[in-house]
């Protein structure tokens, strides 16, 4: 059974000229890092929002771990972690207080929660800043706390929307390296959106390049690159397939 199965998924927002998603279908194997890649407005975030139950599809179907998103969302939410692009933290609370709050939401308490928080703060180099208010954090520090909040409950599937956008090179590398090791150590499936194709090329086992709500191509990054003549990167592949840069809006 695949981790995610999507069939003919469509989404058209009210008053929109074009659909945000135009009949996309794919299957994502378990224990893989899968990237949805493309420019802003391509349909990446809409896809993840439907999988999380934040947005309802216009038509089509989606399953996570064999459960129908439209019918079994309550059960699905117990086994997924969501890390949104917009920082979902309380700025007046400290990093530790934020993590305690999110841990409590998942039913974690006492020493179990304390040990998890201590472990991840150390992993992400945040121990010395744990008792500072989030409003005092840099963008990279906020991203790291945001990620920790999404994995405290040991999800079977982790969904990340642009997890490294707007951060410094050091934080970007730290997050990418962690996702690789976390995937290997736990066999967790990771879904990830990005318009940073160089990063995705190194991180993802498989990618789907999306443009104007459609999947342009899908497969292992190096396989896709090798199949295209005079192509040496995902960025070059995107330009060849769409006629524009991923940075174009």
Task: Please give the residue ranges for each predicted region.
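Catalytic Walker B motif of ABC-type/P-loop ATPase nucleotide-binding domains
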Residues: 158-162
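A short, flexible loop at the N-terminus of ABC-type nucleotide-binding domains that lies
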Residues: 1-6, 10-23, 30, 73
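Helical segment within the ABC ATPase nucleotide-binding domain
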Residues: 173-186
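A short, proline-enriched helix->beta-strand linker immediately N-terminal to the Walker B motif
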Residues: 152-156
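Conserved ABC ATPase "signature" region
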Residues: 100, 104, 111-129
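ABC ATPase "signature
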Residues: 218-219
